[in-house]
From Swiss-Prot:
Primary location group: secreted
Database matches in SUPFAM superfamilies: Autotransporter, Pectin lyase-like
Keyword Secreted: yes
Protein's name in the database: Probable outer membrane protein pmp10
Gene expressing this chain: pmp10
Keywords tagged on the record: Cell outer membrane, Cell wall, Membrane, Secreted, Signal, Transmembrane, Transmembrane beta strand
Annotated disulfide bonds: none
Autotransporter domain residues: 635-928
């Protein structure tokens, strides 16, 4: 009996569970293109899909619902459930809601109870003007409404644009939002929640917001809320992590007490592990131009870092937090983990009266900063100062660059406060330069950097050994309540001058300032010693310790430590003297730095080798002109006539030791004429113009214009005597053969225009002229051996080639200009070689090949004295000279179209130890 009763109870229970499962199980339904509807073309009536039992929709194709509610606004969402959950499986298809007029909560999708709504696997989801933000009748209530968990998972592109809600959440209103694993772009653009007191221009969540692991860019742009969160408002925790590119741009809140131009969070806001995050141009009226949060954690996760730029708080009275505002009793943590964090151009604007002050973060009453840290190689840049509420007073120490307990991450990067991005007028406002941290500060590791006139005001400051405090002259490190203790002070050399000094101060009664260890002089950019103030021996204001207690130094050497003892620029030695003033209030201890100049060592950008190297460019050009004249004198038909040719010349000189690579190239034309004298001597004359350029593969380029004239003469005599005997040693018969004697004179003038684009200084320009003279004397004789099959003749030859080129002195314009003394190149060479030539049977075509060895017998390599115009510091500049021996190959050809017209051309290749010269010319000759 007992057994039968138990079985009855069990059977009844199973039946009950089965019945309940049947009642509460969601219905599965396939939907597809047939469910699409366009109210502008369809004459029927659209009927929304409204249920109370929950449905799992599966798409079988793309669906578009558009232009709905034009005749009568919809009163329910296109898909809605008032009791249970809804789910949509996209299966790779798209779902679009376009231009929908509706008064329903969730014009597109709605689950009004505390149930859930999920959308997964779509190729694209589009919510455009659903309902429209530009139509106020009927008042819209958002595109998507969910009383429970709203999930977007594994979708492609997602677009919410120009949606409107008179309640919270212009596009989405939900309890909890999860937006994750999207492979396409996610965009929230132009959505509004602008009714009085409403929040979340794009998204409003009464619970949590999670935006994670989306692999394409995510954009929140031009969204507007009235009270809080121009783009996102979250009552619970807001987590944005593991995404690629995130941009919050031009979002805003409009109420007088409006907070969080882009994002407002009442609990924890965490933005971490993203490849790049940008907050730009967002605006609030009261607090937080970009972010307003109770507890904010920012951690860069990729090379793009996190950037806050041009966010503002603007109202009739000054608000708080140009970029970020931390609520009362809140916390803020910033970690540059895998990219920099930068604040630049953020501001507080008051319109009555009109004032603008730069500001990055404002710390609310009793709030605090828990972390400011950067890993090695990365930084947090505050180009806008941090401010703190007058009641933001914390006894908790802010440890700069300290890892969490149990975390071995090396936080040895830089925390930088700088005024370098301020305009000249902005730099005159003290508030734009002063950052306030109302808590004790300890530099645990890495660098604290103060640049360009900033002041860092702390409750007290201490430094751990191994860390570095880097302060420009003109900056101040201040403790308002406790003491300042520094163990490693570094000062950049390029900040010295104009009476500026580093100030380290303790302003509270009986509090002390202590400085120990050597002071390090830095040259971070590598050009600090290019400062022309160092061109003379002088003293600089250096360091001042100021305290109402005592100002002391311990183990500070009289000679600062130079971080770069070997450097370019002005050379010299440093010395330091201290003066105590214990009678003043506050007491001071002041150091003066003495510089003794001993010389100048130019950096590679200043050396200027392109100027003497230009002589080698002129050298190769005049040699090319010489070859063109010589070629034009050799003709198949009449010697008399006029000719013209195009000319191109290239010189490549490799880097050799400290002498950098050099390249010259030029091109132009040559025209001339030839005739025979009464004594049957051949004469030829020519005019040439070349346009060229030189480069030194660093910062300098030179443009050249060359004008040249040349005269060539050839005399033929008989090969006899000593020369005949000498030639008889060679194969072939030489006695009584013609001996060709030739000579050539050439002159060129080269106009040079040099531009030097320094890395760290303004561009300078200079112009000068090169004058080149060339003389050539040569002799050759032809033999006609029968054993040469490819050629008819061969002709040994010898030449004496003299070239002299002078570079004029000149000076560049500008404060960074240089002066160059004149220099010259003299070269005497003895080319020897043999020429092979072949003629056609009709004597209307020929080609030739010349092989030469060219030793330079006498050489004066170019160099010049170079000086800085502003200071007179000088040095010797040497050219990257060509080797003194060369091998040359010359190939040429002539073709006579008729007795009156002939085409001629040649190619020359010359190789030296570390250089190559190529030139080519092609032209024609009209003969008569």
């Amino acid at each position: 009996m007992k057994s039968q009763f138990s079985w009855l109870v069990l059977s009844s229970t199973l039946a009950c569970f089965t019945s309940c499962s049947t009642v509460f199980a969601a219905t599965a339904e396939n939907i597809g293109p047939s469910d699409s509807f366009d109210g502008s073309t369809n004459t029927g009536t659209y009927t929304p899909k409204n249920t109370t039992t929950g449905i799992d929709y599966t798409l079988t194709g793309d669906i578009t619902l558009q232009n709905l509610g034009d005749s009568a606004a919809l009163t329910k969402g296109c898909f809605s459930d008032t009791t249970e959950s809804l789910s949509f499986a996209g299966k790779g298809y798209s779902l679009s809601f376009l231009n929908i007029k509706s008064s329903a909560e969730g014009a597109a999708l709605s689950v009004t109870t505390d149930k859930n709504l999920s959308l997964t696997g779509f190729s694209s989801l589009t919510f455009l003007a659903a309902p429209s933000s530009v139509i106020t009748t009927p008042s819209g209530k958002g595109a998507v409404k969910c009383g429970g968990d709203l999930t977007f998972d594994n979708n492609g592109t997602i677009l919410f644009k120009q949606d409107y809600c008179e309640e919270n959440g212009g596009a989405i209103s939900t309890k909890n939002l999860s937006l994750k694993n999207s492979t396409g772009s996610i965009s929230f653009e132009g959505n509004k929640s602008s009714a009085t007191g409403k929040k979340g221009g794009a998204i409003c969540a009464t619970g949590t917001v999670d935006i994670t692991n989306n692999t394409a860019p995510t954009l929140f742009s031009n969204n507007i809320a009235e009270a809080a969160g121009g783009a996102i408002n979250s009552t619970g925790n807001c987590t944005i992590t593991g995404n690629t590119s995130l941009v919050f741009s031009e979002n805003s809140v409009t109420a007088t007490a409006g907070n969080g131009g882009a994002l407002s969070g009442d609990a924890d806001v965490t933005i971490s592990g993203n490849q790049s995050v940008t907050f730009s141009g967002n605006q609030a009226v009261a607090n937080g131009g970009a972010i307003y949060a109770k507890k904010l954690t920012l951690a860069s996760g990729g090379g793009g870092g996190i950037s806050f730029s041009n966010n503002i708080v603007q109202g009739t009275t000054a608000g708080n937090g140009g970029a970020i505002s931390i609520l009362a009793a809140g916390e803020c943590s910033l970690s540059a983990e895998a990219g920099d964090i930068t604040f630049n151009g953020n501001a507080i604007v008051a319109t009555t009266p009109q004032t603008t002050k730069r500001n990055s973060i404002d710390i609310g009453s009793t709030a605090k900063i828990t972390n400011l840290r950067a890993i090695s190689g990365h930084s947090i840049f505050f180009y806008d100062p941090i401010t703190a509420n007058t009641a933001a007073d914390s006894t908790d120490t802010l440890n700069l660059n300290k890892a969490d307990a149990g975390n071995s991450t090396d936080y040895s990067g830089s925390i930088v406060f700088s005024g370098e991005k301020l305009s000249e007028d902005e730099a005159k406002v003290a508030d734009n330069l002063t950052s306030t941290l109302k808590q004790p500060v300890t530099l645990t590791a890495g660098n604290l950097v103060l640049k360009r006139g900033v002041t860092l005001d702390t409750k007290g400051f201490t430094q751990t050994a191994g860390s570095s405090v880097i302060m420009d002259a003109g900056t101040t490190l201040k403790a308002s309540t406790e003491e300042v203790t520094l163990t490693g002070l570094s000062i950049p050399v390029d900040s010295l001058g104009e009476g500026k000094k580093v100030v380290i101060a303790a302003s509270a009664a009986s509090k002390n300032v202590a400085l120990s260890g050597p002071i390090l002089l830095l040259d971070n950019q590598g050009n600090a010693y290019e400062n022309h103030d160092l061109g003379k021996t002088q003293d600089f204001s250096f360091v001042q310790l100021s305290a109402l207690g005592t100002a002391t130094t311990t183990d500070v050497p009289a000679v600062p430590t130079v971080a770069t003892p070997t450097h370019y620029g002005y050379q010299g030695t440093w010395g330091m003297t201290w003066v105590d003033d214990t009678a003043s209030t506050p007491k001071t201890k002041t150091a003066t730095l003495a510089w003794t100049n001993t010389g100048y060592l130019p950096n590679p950008e200043r050396q200027g080798p392109l100027v003497p190297n230009s002589l080698w460019g002129s050298f190769s050009d005049i040699q090319a002109i010489q070859g063109v004249i010589e070629r034009s004198a050799l003709t198949l038909c009449s010697d008399r006539g006029f000719w013209a040719a195009g000319v191109a010349n290239f010189l490549d000189k490799d880097k050799k030791g400290e002498k950098r690579k050099y390249r010259h190239k030029s091109g132009g034309y040559a025209i001339g004429g030839a005739a025979q004298t009464c004594s049957e001597n051949l004469i030829s004359f020519a005019f040439c113009q070349l346009f060229g350029s030189d480069k030194d593969f660093l910062v300098a380029k030179n443009h050249t214009d060359t004008y040249a004239g040349a005269f060539y003469i050839q005399h033929i005599t008989e090969c006899s005597g000593f020369i005949g005997c000498l030639l008889d040693k060679l194969p072939g018969s030489w006695s009584h053969k013609p001996l060709v004697l030739e000579g050539q004179l050439a002159y060129s003038h080269v106009s040079n225009d040099l531009k030097t684009k320094y890395t760290a200084y303004p561009e300078v320009k200079g112009s000068w002229g090169n004058n080149a003279f060339n003389m050539m004397l040569g002799a050759s004789s032809h033999s006609y051996p029968e054993y040469l099959h490819c050629f008819d003749t061969y002709a040994p030859y010898i030449k004496l080639n003299l070239t002299y080129i002078r570079q004029d002195s000149f000076s560049e314009k500008g404060t960074e200009g240089r002066s160059f003394d004149d220099s010259n190149l003299f070269n005497l060479s003895l080319p020897i070689g043999v020429k092979f030539e072949k003629f056609s049977d009709c004597n209307d075509f020929s080609y030739d090949l010349t092989l030469s060895y060219v030793p330079d017998l006498i050489r004066n390599d170019p160099k010049c004295t170079t000086a800085l115009v502003i200071s007179g510091a000088s040095w010797e500049t040497y050219a990257n000279n060509l080797a003194r021996q060369a091998l040359q190959v010359r190939a040429g050809s002539h073709y006579a179209f008729s007795p009156m017209f002939e085409v001629l051309g040649q190619f020359v290749f010359e190789v030296r130890g570390s250089s190559r010269i190529y030139n080519v010319d092609l032209g024609g000759k009209f003969q008569f």
